[in-house]
Amino acid sequence: MKNRLLIMILLLLPMVAMSQVDTGARKRVMEEYRQQYRQQFNEYKDSISGQFIQYLKQRWDEKQLFQGEHQPVRPEPVLQPESDTLSDTLHSEQLPTGDMVTLQVEQFQPTTTDKVATYVAEVFNIAFYGKQLTFKVPVNVSKIKLSGSREYQISNYWQQLNKEKLNQVTLQLAGQKQELRLNGWGLFDLTRQLTASIYPNNADQQVALAVYLLNAMHYDVRMGCVGGNLVILMASASKIYDIPFTVVSNVRYYAFRPIGAKEELKGRLYTYSQQLDGANHGIDLFMSETPQLGGRLCSNPYKNRFGGRDITIYVNQGLMDFYAQYPQMELKMYANAAIDEVFYLALERNIKPLIEGKNTYRAVSTLLQYVQEGFGYQVDNLQFGREKNFFCEENFYYPANDCEDRALLFSYLVRMFVGVDVVLLEYADHVAAAVCFPKEAKVKGDYYLYRNNQYVVCDPTCKGAKVGQVSNKYKKQSPKIIQTA
């Protein structure tokens, strides 16, 4: 019952913070939360010092370590396709559809800021993607030594941690999560960076401390051991590509080494099956809001000229660095991600004037042409040596993009500045988009029927392709339809 009450309070905190409630009511909610959190952390410490510490000492189970699911590689053309092979005559034809892909996200807010209690602390300064952060950690924590990666050694280390005021550290971490608007992955990354700062020369100790802290914030992470090295096993509802994983109790756990570790994970994996009480929330990777990571803009802005206008757009360098290390996910996760507020204003200032005064069809046509002509084209394997989906802002940072990035960018521009619905069309070797025009627009062209509405095909990659034009090879395919927010 206590656990449920705490989680309900935690889930309500973001709404409380954003709503226009009176100060007195907000203080009462916060104080109730703080009392519950302190009590819950004490219960967490009790559970560790009791049965769970003893459980960690037992021999860990051997689990199969899968070598990561590779991100699908689309056999895209090396050169940007052009519309020479498309017919100039547009006919309205309903095309066959495949699966419908929607995004369902469970978000979890672990804690909020609290007044840090007085205690003897060691100060650690972290440069977190353009933000300078300071953490106060109980002075004894950095002195506690993990003597090895055996079960009893880890158990003894956790028992020593349990004597320290680490609830003050989790409060600081959770406070930064709120302040910087981090999602679960952002907090996971920040926790790893903090533990790397505390134990710069002991990778195993970084893992053991990170798992302790994340468990205390109710996240479902575990320790594993591969080839004598500890790893963090992170539960996530989102599919992550190219990261080794194991399965425990039908839950997929992705294996992460400490930051900076170079060793490839090889060998048998050993871990424990029992879940620590209350640590049952997977790490969410969905970007429901954009992290606030410093104000430094990149030194090399996107510049172009289109429609008689000079277009210059800067993006946040810290955000680009954050996205550069972000795990690769399914396309639907990018298609529905939030965008940076400053970046949105730059788009509004530079792109929106291109379509002012135009009807829906002409506005969509202009944006389609802009995306077709306004960016260099290069497939991911040539630009990065691997597959890489872009968040929207990354299109204005890297020198080139490919089909899925263009389709995603086009969908954002149409939704933001034209105000009509867009879906993505994921073919076996290509990604395009489709726009739901108002019925009175009477737009001709190939379309898909989705939720009883016609979505007219738009291909932002094929240079010169008009609204409603699609290559004959794709008319015979049934793409996945990815819903956008």
For every predicted segment, state its role.
Residues 10-18:
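Hydrophobic h-region of N-terminal signal peptides that target proteins for export
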Residues 27, 31-213:
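Long, contiguous, compositionally biased segments that the model treats as domain-scale units
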Residues 139-143, 147-191, 333-398, 461:
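Secondary-structure boundary elements
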Residues 197-210, 219, 378-438:
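Active-site neighborhood of thiol-dependent amide/isopeptide-bond enzymes
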Residues 205-352:
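Extended, non-transmembrane interaction/recognition domains
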Residues 221-250, 355-358, 405-485:
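Hydrophobic/aromatic-rich core segments of domains that either
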